[in-house]
C-alpha cells in the first residue's frame, strides 16, 4: 500500500539531551546505512547499534545510537529505524536532512500512526487514543487514553455490532430462503425484543459520555459568591500562587480569572468570578454578567459565603440560583468566626483549605474509570448517536408492522456507523483529515 519510506523528527524540536529521528518503510534500513559508519544491513530486529552519522566525505557528523525494528513486529508493521542523536536543534535538523537526501520522504503529520492503522495493527479508535495520550493534561485523561490504546472501544462496541449482525442475518435468511420449512418465518414481533435490548445497551454507553468528556478535559469549576467573601483568596490558595488580586475593596475582581488544579487524578478548571450583586458600576456589571454566563455552563460550583456574617438576602439568592447545580457550600474566614453552620469551613487567607480538598476528593473518586470504558471522542460519540437514531427508526417501523426486509436498511446503517468508529468502514478523505491533526513523527 505504501511504497515510499518516510522520516520525521519524533521528539520535541528544541535543545535537549536526545532527539529521535524515525524512519518507516521497506528502505528504512538501507537509507540509514548510507549515512551510518557501521554495517546494519543484516542486523537483527530490536537491536541497538552504536556509531557515527557520516557525511558523503565520510566525516563524522554526530555520535548516535541506531535502533533497528524489522517488520511486522513494529509500530507501523513496516521496517522502522530510530536514530538517537544529540538533542540540539541544529544537529537534529541536519541529520533529518541527510536522511531525506538519502532517499526518504518527509512524513506527513500522523503518517506513522496512519500506516499502523492501514496495516491492521490498530483500529481507528486506538489511533485516536494515541493522540489523546499525547494531549492528555491529567492522570485520568492519560488513563482513559491507555485504555483506548489497549482496545477498550473495540471491546465495548463489538457486542453491539455482533447483535446487529445477528438481526441482519436472520432477515437475510428469510429473504433468501423463504421456501425452506426449517427457516422460521420472521416477524417484527421477533425483532422488537432484540432491538429494545440493543437500545438499552447503547443508552448505557451514551449516559456516561458526559462523564468521559469531563474527565478527559477537566471539570469546569466556578467559584461564586458576593463581593469580598474571599473568592480570589480561595483561588490563590487552591492554585498555591497569587493569580487573582486580593484587596478589602468589594468588587476588585471584574473579569474572570482561571487556573487548573489536580485533585487526585481529576483536573478542575477553576474560574474565579466577579462577585454577584446589584451594581451601578458599568465595568463591574459586565464582569457580573460574564460570571452568570459561566455559571450556566459550569459542572461544579464552589459557593462561598463570609462565615463571619449571617446570610443576607443576596446570599439566599445565590443559594437559589445554584440549587440545581452540583455544588459545595463553603464558609470562609474561619479565622474570624466559629463553625456554626453545616458546610465546609476554611480560611482562604491563611491557606487553611484542607476540608475543601477532602470534600473534592470524596466527590470525584476513581471509581468512574472502574466501570465500563468511557467514550470522550467527539467523532465516536457522534457516530454512536447516529447508530442509535438508525435503530430508533427501525423500531418505529417495527411498531408499524413494516416488513423486515425494509427495516433492514436502518439496521444496516446502524451497523455501518458502529464499524465506522473502528475504521472498518471509512472514507479516505475523512481519514486524511483525522490523521492530519496528529503531530509530525507520530
How should each PLM-predicted stretch be described?
Residues 50-70, 251-279, 297-300:
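Switch I (G2) and immediately adjacent beta-strands of P-loop GTPase domains
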Amino acid at each position: 500500500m505504501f511504497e515510499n519510506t518516510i522520516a520525521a523528527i519524533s521528539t520535541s524540536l528544541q535543545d535537549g539531551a536526545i532527539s529521535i529521528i524515525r524512519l518507516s518503510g521497506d528502505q528504512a534500513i538501507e537509507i540509514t546505512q548510507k549515512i551510518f559508519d557501521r554495517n546494519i544491513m543484516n542486523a537483527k530486529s530490536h537491536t541497538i547499534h552504536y556509531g557515527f552519522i557520516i557525511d558523503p566525505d565520510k566525516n563524522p557528523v554526530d555520535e548516535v545510537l541506531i535502533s533497528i525494528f524489522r517488520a511486522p513486529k513494529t509500530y507501523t508493521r513496516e521496517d522502522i529505524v530510530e536514530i538517537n542523536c544529540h538533542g540540539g536543534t541544529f544537529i537534529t535538523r541536519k541529520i533529518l536532512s541527510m536522511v531525506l537526501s538519502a532517499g526518504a520522504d518527509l512524513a506527513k503529520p500522523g503518517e506513522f500512526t496512519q500506516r499502523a492503522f492501514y496495516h491492521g495493527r490498530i483500529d481507528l479508535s486506538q489511533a485516536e487514543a494515541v493522540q489523546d495520550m499525547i494531549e492528555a493534561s491529567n492522570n485520568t485523561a492519560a488513563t482513559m487514553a491507555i485504555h483506548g490504546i489497549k482496545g477498550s472501544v473495540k471491546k465495548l462496541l463489538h457486542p453491539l455490532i455482533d447483535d446487529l449482525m445477528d438481526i441482519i442475518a436472520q432477515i437475510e435468511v428469510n429473504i433468501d430462503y423463504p421456501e425452506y420449512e426449517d427457516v422460521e418465518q420472521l416477524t417484527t414481533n421477533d425483532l422488537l425484543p432484540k432491538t429494545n435490548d440493543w437500545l438499552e445497551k447503547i443508552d448505557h454507553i451514551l449516559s456516561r459520555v458526559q462523564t468521559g468528556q469531563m474527565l478527559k478535559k477537566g471539570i469546569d469549576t466556578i467559584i461564586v459568591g458576593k463581593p469580598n467573601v474571599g473568592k480570589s483568596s480561595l483561588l490563590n490558595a487552591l492554585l498555591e500562587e497569587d493569580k487573582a488580586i486580593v484587596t478589602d475593596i468589594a468588587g476588585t475582581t471584574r473579569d474572570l480569572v482561571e487556573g487548573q488544579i489536580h485533585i487526585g487524578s481529576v483536573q478542575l478548571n477553576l474560574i474565579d468570578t466577579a462577585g454577584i450583586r446589584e451594581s451601578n458600576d458599568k465595568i463591574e456589571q459586565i464582569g457580573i454578567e460574564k460570571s452568570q454566563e459561566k455559571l450556566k455552563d459550569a459542572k461544579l460550583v464552589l459557593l462561598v459565603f463570609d462565615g463571619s456574617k449571617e446570610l443576607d438576602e443576596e446570599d439566599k439568592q445565590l443559594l437559589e440560583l445554584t440549587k440545581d447545580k452540583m455544588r459545595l457550600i463553603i464558609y470562609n474566614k474561619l479565622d474570624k468566626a466559629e463553625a456554626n453552620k453545616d458546610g465546609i469551613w476554611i480560611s482562604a487567607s491563611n491557606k487553611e483549605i484542607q476540608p475543601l480538598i477532602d470534600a473534592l476528593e470524596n466527590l470525584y473518586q476513581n471509581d468512574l474509570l472502574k466501570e465500563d470504558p468511557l467514550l470522550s471522542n467527539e467523532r465516536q460519540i457522534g457516530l454512536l448517536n447516529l447508530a442509535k437514531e438508525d435503530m430508533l427508526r427501525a423500531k418505529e417501523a417495527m411498531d408499524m408492522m413494516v416488513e423486515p426486509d425494509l427495516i433492514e436498511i436502518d439496521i444496516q446503517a446502524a451497523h455501518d456507523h458502529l464499524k465506522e468508529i473502528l475504521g472498518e468502514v471509512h472514507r479516505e478523505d475523512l481519514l486524511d483529515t483525522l490523521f492530519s491533526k496528529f503531530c509530525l513523527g507520530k
